[in-house]
């Protein structure tokens, strides 16, 4: 059974691998470590059978939350792990009185956009040609509770 726990430094190789498999411009191990050590960031891993199948990075600044990264291993997609990670960060946000959460997503990432919409997020802006490799627009999505 899958469970979620706080990320620890020993998870860096697995999370770096998830980054490389999930993003065209992955974060380096150093960037991930910086986030892990930041007092503004919360990071969790989703573990299935002692294997890290997903992770997310949630940042809180001035009372607002931002989903910085979320990734699920390619072979573990379609099992609801992204939803479980989102539910976990939403509960954490509520526990810390964070009502509004934002994120950015590639305009072509239909699976992620569908997940975010199912969690109450709406597209509020578009950043034209924001992403590289390939060049693509970003949707800025918000879930506002305030």
What spans do the regions from the language model cover?
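Acetyl-CoA-dependent GNAT
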Residues: 2-75, 79, 83-88, 92, ...
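Conserved hydrophobic beta-strand within the GNAT/NAT acetyltransferase core sheet
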Residues: 67, 101-105
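Short amphipathic helical patch at the helix-1/turn junction of helix-turn-helix
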Residues: 72, 106-107
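Short glycine/proline-centered loop/turn elements that form peptide/ligand docking sites
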Residues: 86, 109-112, 129-134
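Conserved catalytic-core motifs of GNAT/GCN5-like acyltransferases
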Residues: 104, 117, 122-138
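Divalent-cation-assisted or electrostatically stabilized phosphate/pyrophosphate-binding catalytic cores
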Residues: 141
């Amino acid at each position: 059974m899958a469970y979620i726990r706080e990320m620890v430094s020993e998870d860096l190789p697995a999370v770096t691998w998830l980054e490389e498999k999930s993003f065209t411009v992955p974060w380096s191990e150093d960037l991930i470590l910086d986030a892990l050590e930041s007092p503004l960031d919360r990071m969790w891993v989703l573990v299935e059978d002692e294997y890290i199948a997903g992770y997310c990075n949630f940042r809180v600044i001035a009372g607002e939350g931002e989903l910085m990264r979320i990734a699920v291993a390619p072979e573990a997609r379609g099992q609801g792990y992204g939803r479980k990670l989102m539910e976990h960060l939403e509960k954490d946000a509520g526990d810390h009185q964070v009502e509004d959460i934002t994120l950015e997503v590639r305009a072509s990432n239909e699976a992620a956009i569908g997940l975010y919409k199912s969690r109450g997020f709406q597209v509020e802006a578009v950043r034209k040609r924001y992403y590289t490799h390939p060049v693509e627009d970003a949707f800025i999505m918000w879930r506002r509770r305030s």
